[in-house]
Design a protein with these regions (language model features):
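N-terminal beta-strand/alpha-helix entry module and adjacent surface
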Residues: 1-124, 130-169
Length: 169
């Protein structure tokens, strides 16, 4: 017997939402509020850890930035953020007291996104610096609201302790 289930027959799906199943190759990494769940593919997390640790052995430890790509889906009033890729912001001056998403940086990010993650949208950003506090500073919040508002997230990572945190404004 074959059972056919239509979108209209599912009482859990609200208007404007589409039904979906959670993928198996992805794990929940964070929650940014009761109605906002964050999932990230393992290879993306591994890439971000390696990116964060590239400066550990340098005398001058600058910050590392990447833009997160993926998609946001809604189910029963809850947002599910799926992070499926990350684009490193190369040649960007990044420190906890100075971040500059210049026109040139955005151009490079969009080119890489189109090349590697064409079917995905920007869903947030990543910032890492050794000995960074796991709290969003006023500068990080300003940068987030200017470039990544709405449903997008900020992921902070401290590479030496392997701590991370998510923020949404």
């Amino acid at each position: 017997m074959i059972e056919v289930i239509y979108k209209e027959e599912n009482p859990d799906i609200q208007e404007g939402e589409e039904g979906f199943c959670l993928p198996r190759n992805i794990r929940q990494i964070g929650v940014a509020g009761e109605k906002y769940k964050i999932y990230m593919e393992d290879y993306v997390y591994t890439f971000l850890i390696r990116l964060a640790r590239t400066e550990e052995n340098q005398e001058v430890q600058k910050g590392r930035v990447a833009v997160l790509t993926g998609e946001i889906k809604w189910k029963t009033g809850t947002a599910y953020l799926f992070i499926r890729g990350a684009v490193m912001a190369e040649d960007m001056e990044a420190a906890v007291d100075h971040l500059d998403f210049s026109v040139q940086v955005w151009k490079q990010i969009h080119e890489d996104q189109k090349k590697y993650f064409e079917d995905q949208e920007i869903v947030g950003w990543f910032f890492s610096q050794p000995r960074i506090s796991m709290e969003a500073t006023e500068l990080l919040e300003k940068v987030h609201l200017k470039h990544f508002g709405g449903e997008k997230v900020l992921m902070l990572m401290e590479p030496q302790e392997s701590e991370d945190a998510f923020f949404r404004y």
